[in-house]
């Protein structure tokens, strides 16, 4: 996993150059937005169980066949696995948002995800829908538009962070497609 600083240093070192110019400005912006970034991650982490359960519930409500016999999440064991997997995805998205880099998500979560689900007979469409619901919910928490929130969320314009988080969820959706 490379954070924003490691990426810039690795790039500059590869060119045998000093860190400067646009790279330095990008790091300054990353640092100045650090509190917003941490508040956004805190909003996700503090509401993780609700985000995950709402996403899985929404997926099931839209496709009740999933909980019918032989459905993708029929049985307590399969439902528990579904909730666990959604929680893992959300956790790695939060890691990526905190570090400003998607490599931890790609390396530790998405690598082989589609093949694993296919081998287990888990329907990809349902997973993709749960990810889309999580993306929308996280967007609401980061942009401070979530209804009935319990905790304060990031102050100021956080649209860039919401867009960044959305990009991480898009990577998950692409990996499942």
From Swiss-Prot:
Ligand binding ((2R,3E)-phycocyanobilin 2): 28, 35, 39, 154, 156, 158
Highest taxon of the lineage: Eukaryota
Quaternary structure, from the entry: Heterotetramer of 2 identical alpha chains and 2 identical beta chains which form 2 alpha-beta heterodimers within the heterotetramer. The two alpha-beta heterodimers are rotated to an open configuration in contrast to the closed configuration found in other cryptophyte species due to the insertion of a single amino acid, 'Asp-65', in a conserved region of the alpha chain. In the open form, the central chromophores are not in physical contact but are separated by a water-filled channel.
Gene Ontology CC terms: chloroplast thylakoid membrane; phycobilisome
BP GO terms, sorted: photosynthesis
Extra facts: The light-harvesting system in Cryptophytes contains phycobiliprotein complexes. Unusually they are composed of either phycoerythrin (CPE) or phycocyanin (CPC) but never allophycocyanin (APC), with only one type of biliprotein being present in any one species. Unlike cyanobacteria or red algae these proteins are not arranged into higher-order phycobilisome complexes, and they are found in the thylakoid lumen.
Protein name: Phycoerythrin beta subunit
Positions with a binding annotation for (2R,3E)-phycocyanobilin 3: 77, 82, 84-85
Coiled-coil region list: none
Organism expressing this protein natively: Hemiselmis virescens
């Amino acid at each position: 996993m490379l954070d924003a600083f490691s990426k810039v240093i690795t790039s500059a070192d590869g060119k045998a150059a000093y860190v400067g110019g646009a790279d330095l400005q990008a790091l300054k912006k990353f640092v100045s937005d650090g509190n917003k970034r941490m508040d956004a991650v805190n909003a996700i982490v503090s509401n993780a169980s609700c985000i995950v359960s709402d996403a899985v519930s929404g997926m099931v409500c839209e496709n009740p066949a999933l909980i019918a016999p032989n459905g993708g999440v029929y049985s307590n064991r399969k439902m528990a696995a579904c909730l666990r997997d959604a929680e893992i995805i959300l956790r790695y998205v939060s890691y990526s948002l905190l570090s400003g880099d998607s490599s931890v998500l790609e390396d530790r979560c998405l690598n082989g995800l589609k093949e694993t689900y296919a081998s287990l007979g888990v329907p990809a469409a349902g997973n993709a829908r749960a990810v889309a619901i999580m993306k929308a919910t996280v967007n609401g928490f980061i942009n401070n538009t979530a209804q009935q929130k319990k905790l304060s969320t990031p102050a100021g314009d956080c649209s860039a962070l919401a867009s960044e988080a959305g990009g991480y969820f898009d990577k998950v959706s692409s990996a499942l497609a």
